[in-house]
Amino acid sequence: YAHLDQIDLNENDPITARWSAEAPYHSDKSTHLWIAKQAIEIMKTESNIEANKQAVDFLNYPQYKDLFSKGLYDADYNAEFNDGGTGIGGVFKGGWKSHFYDPDTKENYRGETNPTALTQGKKYFYESGEHLRNKDYEKAFYYLGVATHYFTDATQPMHAANFTAIDTRAIKYHSYFENYVTTIQNQFAVNTGGNYNNSLSTPEEWIDYAARVAKPEIQNITNDKTFKYYNSGKAQLWQEMVTPAVQRSLGEAQRNTAGFLNLWFKTFTKNVKAPSIETALIYDIEGNVIEAGKNYYIVPSESPYQGLTFEWYLANRYDYVTLANKENNGLSGTPMEFEFYKENDAKLHHGESIYLRMKHSNYDQFQYLNWSNYSSWIHLAQKSDSLADFKIKINLDNPTEYNIFTDDYPLNYENINAKKNWIVLGEKKQKPSSWKFIP
């Protein structure tokens, strides 16, 4: 599902503009994530099933939930999960051949038995389990997300039948189909009926089973009529034709993904208890939980009067983030808001992804902290799918202080005593600056 970058023939493609590789937590833009979240809802409803409550507790713990979601998303975009080489037909960079698996031939669309959605799903199922056994929970849930991505690939009829985006009968139909699915998937959400088939005892058996369930629907999605309507620009007609198959496929995908996740938790988490969400809450200096809709000053622990603020930079006319100047030991800076994703509970937790928004700036709407590959300086930007998200983490050396990260880079200040103190991204292995939050 949702390999929209497969159709990036040119930068003006109308579909690619709707998708970003930097929005991993939005289920309305990723059918993979939507299916996984629905599977977790099913397991929550059916908590009497062995390992289901444990799965829900782990996958709803904010830090692990985010890492799981990131793994689901990265599987489409990180080179280590894309074994396509030159690409589909030598045209596309990448190729995603490891995201396909025909259960009858055991092959991907290139006629190879490795890599496929089955071989890679199996690989990361066990790799994530090993990380959990080694108590590296962050890697465990990230790679479980990757494994689940490959599993949900197998639930998509086109991926189970090796129908690609450059099939000459309907160029890019694969991608337009997946885009259409994201617009209607909520109509077909289920929250009961998880498939916990005990006869399927390995990840490869589950992936093969899911593909066998999905593949027969290909005749209802790719046929002479749907191709005719698609090629003549009659989107409404082909969409009406495929909708019943989409409904059936998504129903099976949600229920079977619950079974796949159930197997992982039964296999690897016996006698392992999920941490309490209460232990992960982030607090301001007055001891209150950080919440959505409230304003805070973000200040260095060593200089609690210098809040983050902004300054216009003439060279490129951006607002850049700095520390406010000291003003007679009086608090200075720009109030900020922690902006949550709509699916979060509006209380901030350790390792949870949020946006950081200044309450005002020199440009309307350009108020969100962001960064680019061209500079380590933090600047202000508009809200978009490519906007940087930040994670607040408890400083283990001093639990009353916090570190701030984006994509594993620490948010740091350069020199607390400098006249101008720009906020920059440190190196991943560099000691992070410590921060506190003043309401």
Where do the protein language model's features map onto the residues?
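Short alpha-helix carrying the canonical HExxH Zn2+-binding catalytic motif
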Residues: A140-T152
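Surface-exposed interaction patches
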Residues: Y150-D153, P410-N412
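Lectin-like carbohydrate-binding module/patch detector with strong preference for beta-trefoil
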Residues: I277-P439
